[in-house]
């Protein structure tokens, strides 16, 4: 009986169409990318937390260099963004090919927009990485004048990274539900499959909120350095912060494009896997 069950189980696996096998392959890459993003979120959060604790006077002789966490987070986020870009462009090419063959009856513009926004994300984290490395080379955080406004800005930054984590978690849910959507076609026992459009849309909204907050933070840090710390801090510290402002502007553009795309996908009201971020 066990031998027959195994044969039947293998036969079911072979029934997965070539198109769905390609979709599952892309979803696997996307899942790995999101796990890398979530790991990067931990580094970003620790970076922000150490800064806040130092500003509040909780200093330790063995305090780690916060910029090491920032660099590690940027490296991981850059790797994840490259993987997501590969997934987004491959998914767009596949659906565009089907559109040319007359197999679909809806616009492929949202998929194209998501693919384009993925390039902005690569640029964003590349610029952030350059800024983080320059920060590591040049900055002694003890020279920054701590004011109540400075602490508020650091608290906002910490909240922004919490929102980022929730956004990545939402896309993790969307990706897992996309797996269920495909696997459910070959498993009759799964009758109630969730629509991945909803967590994807929530995640896209959270990313935009996070990036707006980080732009505000980077601008406030720049103003603080110029107005409050100009006489005590190396002027070269301002340069990495200019890069942070530029990167966050690019991030807002990318997240706005992808949010609009996910809104259009949600309006289709069709159960399809979610690709991109």
What role is predicted for each listed range?
Residues 210, 250-257:
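Alpha-helical membrane-embedded segments
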Residues 1-246, 260-277:
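Glycine-rich, hydrophobic membrane-spanning regions of integral membrane proteins that mediate transport
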